[in-house]
Amino acid sequence: MKEILSIRNLNKTFESGFKLKNINFDIKEGEVVSLIGESGSGKTSISKIIVGLLKAEGQILFKGMNILKYPKKINGKIQMIFQSPYSSLNPKYKIKDIILEGVIYQKVLEKEENIDEYLLNILNDVGLDKEILNKYPHELSGGQRQRVGIARTVAVKPDLIIADEILTALDALTQIQILELFQKLKENKKISYLFISHDINVVKKISDRLLIIKDGEIIESGTKEKIFSKPEKEYTKKLIEISGIR
């Protein structure tokens, strides 16, 4: 598989003095990579740099192009799902308009594609009923809102989805359901994923590789089998122990 995203020598110093130090990793086509670390370790800062919300030094190659220099070249092909779906869904829009906003703006559909059929297919992909299309975000449960956020993201046909702590506010059953949804999307669509999480247990099943970050530096990486069977760093062992995995 080819690399869809390559991060090389990424560095950034914040006003607080916190630093991202020499970040290097790749994500291949169709691969799920999880970035794991405690709160304040730099996970979300990296995701914001990738999507152009923060500037940094180094290289981020997306399909071979340095998007730190040419952020507009992303053109919707990298999408981000946020921790709080409610805050990212326009409360004045019905669910149908929320899902289709990016589709229409970015002219995602081919001429032969019917927008109503496309919308129903997206709903089916994320496990939502068409009855919710005329509802507003405040009328939905937390799990439904998160599925709407996923639907809106998948609808624009991205190559890479960054999911930032999206399970944190959900109950255990809904977490399992959302992970199963991503597993299905992973199998059926050619999308790469970067999961951001403080809980190594939550993303264990769906991940192909894990990146462990501490104090702005990636200290360990490898397949999930390697990380769980032979963790090299004490910090990694601590994360595994905290999650209750044996």
Regions found by a protein language model. Give the residues of each.
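Conserved ABC ATPase "signature" region
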Residues: 113-131, 240-241
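A short, surface-exposed alpha-helical micro-motif characterized by mixed small hydrophobic
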Residues: 203-205
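ABC ATPase "signature
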Residues: 221-222
